[in-house]
């Protein structure tokens, strides 16, 4: 085919190009016509008033472009006024901002072309507001023009503008910090915004802004009496979500605000949470009202903080001298003083019929021991029962136990006489002269148990127990050592350090005694970071021979060291590094336990991730036992860290579910105990149904721990569903003596103190972690991790460490004369009111009672009468003051 033919059949190049151009032109025309149509439609939709506003704004923009400097000023002023009045309420995009959208970049060019002048700063103000809607947010143009504009109050432009400005300040501050650029101008601007937030129910925005700038303490001067409680509530609720040391800075700010308005009881709660003795002393010394001082003494007593208040009556309150009397008053008012026997708890007539019970002597002894524990737990603190404290000593249940069972049976007198020191000592005294060594050892341990949480100037526990530290059998010495640890937990006593340190360091001493001495020192100096105790234990770990490193009691030496750093976070780093340099199994256990305890209850996500990583690593074959123990502790540590923060606690439940499916046996046996710690005395159906499933596991170690954890979860609640599940387990395991023993212990815990007590270590509206309560729970849980060696063998008396966590969940109100004052209170489920405007209700589904009353987990009380004002939040022992004037800021 010729070229002529081709050219005749195909369009020329120019024609094709023209066709393309024509297509593009038509597309552009179509788009323009669409835009024009849209604009015409918008103009047609506008009302006359809006059209007038649009024309006025365009004229003002034109005037800014063309007018002389004199006219520019008036045009800018008019423009500013129109925008300001429209942005004061931002329910929708204000019309002036909408109409000025096409002119934003025109105004930016004008601004850039002008020399520095008052008119330029005025235009910067306008551009700052317009930038909120039109500019590229990554350029922070609202902030840029704000800093270049006039120094008028940013709040003139409305709430939405101020919030937008605050977010840009936070972003700009972060980028400048990375570049190490100065930030003084940002801080100055932030401090002009904070008062606006605080006076417009936006306390959360003010706190967040200053917290991002690392200057949370600067909020204190701006806080007023009417918003102080809301500010502090938001600050304290944020603490669990922040890393160290930001959490400490937040708490110190809340403390400063409370002190500013003389809210001393709230300030003291924050100081206790900080565990700062200097602040605690300052708060106590600042109180001039004797009633307020007494209330503060009761608050310190709950945390077992050792202090001298300089007054006998105050010291009695601080030392829990009358705690037994208060508890007996509660029991009498609730008609609970009649003692119960184990059969009342077991309700064996409701269990499925069984055969072959009691066939062996071993089983019978185990059953009697279980009954001993159940009897002590159910009647704890009531100073009466029908098995042990009987008139005819020959019929006493103590002598129905054998060998090591006698230790626990005799020590149970201490639990029955819990907090009632005088009566407890008089009843235990005769057993100190017993020829039976186990009975004598039990009496020594019982003395420690009855003295838990109660201080006495005469120091009867130390006077008696110190005589048995150096001489006598291992059983007597072990009971005396642990008894001292229980009696003086949290006392921070240097004289006890001198007594117990030689036992820790003596390499010829049995490993059991050294480890118990280290544990007792940990209990006595819990959360103090005491350098002498730490160096003593570290030195012992270095000097102990290799054979001692494999001793099962070694975990308690590691725990003793870990408890010193309870809740101290980064302050434990030096000790962790030292432990890394020490060889041996106990040092590895101590390393992980110190890490766990130092972050206990903080909810620190990074540490939870670190522990989950340890759990996920398959242990190597050559060091299997050591590594699996560390994984066991790590699984437990996840719950220990997450327990103080509800969201974190919810999240780890899913991880635990996965671990039970795919984890190593060493991890699986720790998960039920972790669930028990996470939800102690808080029977959530989701958790105890899960534990019920694990209680039938093929691995008996898992089953034992799941059964015990069911007791922890339901402790002191008398939960009917849990009681039914435990009765079913008693039938299921009727031929397995160890499992049945665990079921009985769990049943005893469920009815702890006849349903009046709790094991949950948190108190004061679940904000403060009780150091000694946590230490007691950890001691028992670590023993349960190897139940066959300890609790199910001859060391079942370790269960008495749980006494440290026992406290009555009562609300008792006292009058100004110190006498019991029954008043009406509303008790209901606590409601999270953080960040809500106004004064919302803090409880829901409430029922009116007359004090004394019991408070369940997550329940809160408020007075139903205006005749009195409580000196602190309604929990524990509260003093009521006759109402003479309205209190602006309530507890």
Curated annotation (Swiss-Prot):
Record's compositionally biased regions (Basic and acidic residues): 17-30
Xref: SUPFAM superfamilies: ARM repeat
Intervals holding PC repeats: 408-441, 442-478, 479-513, 517-550, 673-704, 705-739
GO cellular component, one term: proteasome regulatory particle, base subcomplex
Molecular function terms from GO: enzyme regulator activity
Keyword field: Phosphoprotein, Proteasome, Repeat
UniProt record, GO biological process: proteasomal protein catabolic process; proteasome-mediated ubiquitin-dependent protein catabolic process; regulation of protein catabolic process
Biased composition (Low complexity): 1-12
Disulfide feature: none
List of residues that carry Phosphoserine: 10
Region (Disordered): 1-48
Top-level division of the source organism's lineage: Eukaryota
Family membership: Belongs to the proteasome subunit S2 family.
Quaternary structure, from the entry: Component of the 26S proteasome. Interacts with ubp6.
Function summary: Acts as a regulatory subunit of the 26 proteasome which is involved in the ATP-dependent degradation of ubiquitinated proteins.
Protein name: 26S proteasome regulatory subunit rpn1
